[in-house]
Amino acid sequence: TLTHYQAARLKPLFESLHVSTKEDKFGGEFALILDKNDGVFSPMVALASILENFKDSYVFCLSVDAPFVEEEQIKALWEVAQKTPNSAIIPRDLQTRHPLCGFYHSSLAPLARQLANEENHKLGFLLQKCGATYVDFKDSKPFTNLNHPHEYEESLKNQSLV
């Protein structure tokens, strides 16, 4: 699965790796962070649940369906995080921002939870409120999402994923 692929390649880059999910469907293979709002499928709920598990630290978040983000992009974001007081460091390419990839500081947990409780599930709103820092990338390919099974299959055929 994409989860296994992402975990295997990203684990060496971090002190710890956690999988955010609504329920344990991995049979104990991963350290999990379970979403705290049952029945609500939202990146804001997931982000709040994730950040509530950490204290005074940046947490790198990446959607499982973005398998082309590599160490190079992660390091570029981390370098900016080390130099700025901002609580969110997010990649941006020529087309758009990528809020499902980036470093979020754990101090954002209360704001993320508040927005989730208010049913405001747009990460862009959180990023606006916290004054996120955007890191520009010329190449958009690393931030491509595989939103459908056929996109995943096509990537396998093209050997984009190995």
Region annotations inferred by a language model:
Residues T1-N120, F125-P142, H150, E154-K157:
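Nucleotide and nucleotide-moiety/phosphate-recognizing core
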Residues N158-V162:
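Terminal amphipathic alpha-helical/low-complexity segments used for targeting or macromolecular assembly
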